[in-house]
């Protein structure tokens, strides 16, 4: 964080972001038509999508390092072990879409974020030597919660704009969700790597951590739990935002 490049980038962002908003607001052919955010439902749904990105994407990185560092898996095995999260989304997304079309999307989207928050909180009980099935269950539950959120929330967003502006709406959604993902990875990795010796981090990140002792891994496990609590709290905020958005 003390690197001049990082500091310079943050300063540039603070200066350029308001300028970008001004240009987009008053330009003849804006890249992003900001007037779509005047609709309260769309604004709330995109805010929830941003929070979803903030609370989900870093989780994949955290667990890759957990499997490699704490459990001694090679990178390929660590990646395969993330499959329950994708399977959870695969099952819940279409069912959530059908439910939202019939019963509405607001409550279901909020419930999805709540389910994910519970699973993220449960992940803080994992130890370095926990059996795989425990983390697999919680990853699957996060995936189910994400699927319950994504389909209804996206449908609500797209339903607020006319057909000829849905491309703009989809672009805005992806921009904010990806922004949340980038910020999530930056902040969570800062938490996870805090106070962990560089040689230990190198072994964890490179997938050669099988020789690390429990004492060497303890700072990493502690930081991982802290990061998971942060992600769980962020998901609760997302659930509240989803629940408070207008019905129509």
Model-derived regions: residue spans:
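Intrinsically disordered, low-complexity segments enriched in polar/charged residues with Gly/Pro
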Residues: 21-23, 94-95, 207, 214-216
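Transmembrane core module of solute transporters
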Residues: 1-20, 27-154, 158, 162-164, ...
């Amino acid at each position: 964080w003390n690197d001049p490049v990082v500091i310079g980038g943050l300063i540039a962002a603070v200066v350029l972001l308001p300028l970008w908003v001004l240009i987009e607001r008053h330009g003849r052919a804006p890249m992003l038509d900001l007037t779509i955010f005047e609709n309260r439902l769309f604004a709330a749904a995109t805010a929830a999508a941003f929070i979803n990105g903030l609370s989900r994407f870093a989780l994949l990185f955290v667990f890759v390092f957990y499997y490699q560092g704490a459990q001694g898996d090679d990178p390929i095995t660590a990646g395969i072990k993330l499959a329950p999260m994708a399977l959870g989304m695969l099952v819940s997304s279409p069912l959530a879409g059908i439910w939202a079309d019939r019963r509405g999307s607001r409550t279901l989207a909020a419930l999805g974020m709540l389910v994910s928050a519970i699973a993220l909180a449960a992940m803080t009980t994992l130890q370095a030597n926990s059996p795989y099935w425990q983390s697999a269950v919680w990853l699957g539950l996060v995936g189910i919660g994400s699927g319950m959120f994504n389909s209804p929330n996206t449908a609500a967003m797209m339903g607020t704009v006319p057909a000829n502006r849905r491309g703009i709406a989809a672009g805005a959604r992806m921009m904010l969700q990806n922004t949340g993902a980038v910020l999530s990875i930056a902040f969570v990795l800062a938490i996870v790597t805090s106070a962990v010796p560089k040689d230990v981090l190198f072994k964890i990140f490179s997938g050669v951590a099988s020789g690390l002792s429990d004492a060497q891994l303890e700072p990493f496990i502690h930081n991982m739990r802290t990061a998971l609590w942060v992600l769980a709290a962020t998901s609760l905020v997302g659930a509240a935002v989803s629940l408070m958005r207008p019905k129509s």
